Amino acid sequence: MTTLTKFALGMMGQLRPKPAQGDSATSLILPPPDKHGGLPLMEALAKRRSSREFARDTLPLSLLSGLLWAAYGENRSEGGRTAPSALNAQEIDVFVALPSGAYRYDAADHELRLVAANDLRRVTGYQDFVDEAPLDLVYVADHSRMNRVPVGQRTSYASVAAGAIAQNVYLFSAGNGLATVIRAWIDRNAIANALGLTHDQEVLLSQTVGYPK
């Protein structure tokens, strides 16, 4: 679907998911992440870039596991994360749009939990490449976890947290031969409806990840 068509559908409130490809498992248990792989940090920084051309090849679970752990996994026994959040609110949820369905990343159990048995990839952005890339991440702020943050500042605080997660994804991608791009030109209402979000949840950004084309 072209960008222009998607934008027109979005303006009409008609940007919809596609049927899932294959079975939508209620959960996907991820293997333990490899915390010793990838490039050294300075080399990954040197290779960090945005890419908008993706192969359709599926990422193996082992690589998806490392990607999600690097993005926002737990890296301390007390539940600390790989990306910061103000007052440790941990208000960001990472959703993963796959051909088989949309999942929420559960960092505590390091697994994916099904939230929608549809292929939501084309809903995650107006760009045409999001439809066929193997996965699209969506960063959602849950304002109900931000009671200690003034209401008027919650979106700003959460956006900073989402940006830190996105940079983790960039560095993991650079260090593991993947392509990625962060995206803010998205239909937030369509994404929220497709994911079944509540009024306390706010869609912030999307990020496409895959092998370079």
Language model: regions and residue ranges:
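N-terminal amphipathic, basic helical "cap/leader" segment at the start of enzyme domains
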Residues: 1-133
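Glycine-centered structural positions embedded in regular secondary structure
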Residues: 8-13, 163, 207-210
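Small-aliphatic-rich amphipathic alpha-helix that forms the alpha element of a beta-alpha
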Residues: 48, 67, 94, 137-191
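Short, surface-exposed helix-loop/turn micro-motifs enriched in polar/charged residues
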Residues: 86, 180-183, 199
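Solvent-exposed coil/turn segments that connect beta secondary-structure elements
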Residues: 99-101, 142, 212
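Short coil/turn connectors at secondary-structure junctions
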Residues: 131-135, 200-201
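A glycine-rich helix N-cap at a beta->alpha junction
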Residues: 196-213
